[in-house]
Regions:
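A generic structural signal for alpha-helix starts
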Residues: 65-69, 116-119
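Amphipathic alpha-helical segments
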Residues: 66-81, 124
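Vicinal oxygen chelate
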Residues: 1-55, 59, 83, 87-104, ...
Length: 146
């Protein structure tokens, strides 16, 4: 657990290690004021395009050889029960647990992004050589556009 203040912004965080929950490091953060993001600095918004096509991260797909066991660890960590499809739902995002789809073992298979225009994303990814099997694929992780 850590806390840091700079200027008018205070950030608090706790990290959950993969050894405890499986699959990924999870960072749970709280900023005051709520729209600040201290970890990126006090002026981070100046570096973000106001016309950006990306709207938000709306989900993550976790893969495992034992998706039910992994899901149970995450349920316990977040204090939330998954539905019958092994999906933990939050107010504006979700975590889906699936079988090991690419034989890389337990971990993040994909991030789900809400975007304004999928075609623009796919064109840019193709131009940059970031597609694999028809998906946007960066650093071993797929990016699924919603």
């Amino acid at each position: 657990e850590a806390e840091r203040s700079e200027g008018h912004v205070t950030g608090k965080t706790i990290h959950l290690h993969p050894k405890h929950i499986g699959g990924a490091i999870v960072s749970i953060d709280k900023m005051e004021p709520e729209l600040a993001w201290l970890w990126a600095g006090l002026d981070w918004e100046k570096c973000v395009s106001k016309n950006d096509n990306a709207e938000r991260l709306c989900g993550v797909v976790m893969q495992s050889n034992d998706k039910s066991a992994l899901c149970k660890k995450w349920e316990k960590a977040f204090g939330v029960q998954a539905d019958e499809n092994l999906q933990i739902n939050f107010s504006d995002s979700r975590i889906k647990f699936v079988d090991d789809l690419d034989q890389r073992g337990e971990g993040i298979n994909a991030f789900e992004l809400s975007v304004k225009n999928k075609e623009i994303f796919y064109e840019k990814a193709e131009e940059l050589g970031l597609t694999k099997n028809g998906l946007i694929h960066i650093g071993g992780v797929n990016f699924l556009l919603q």
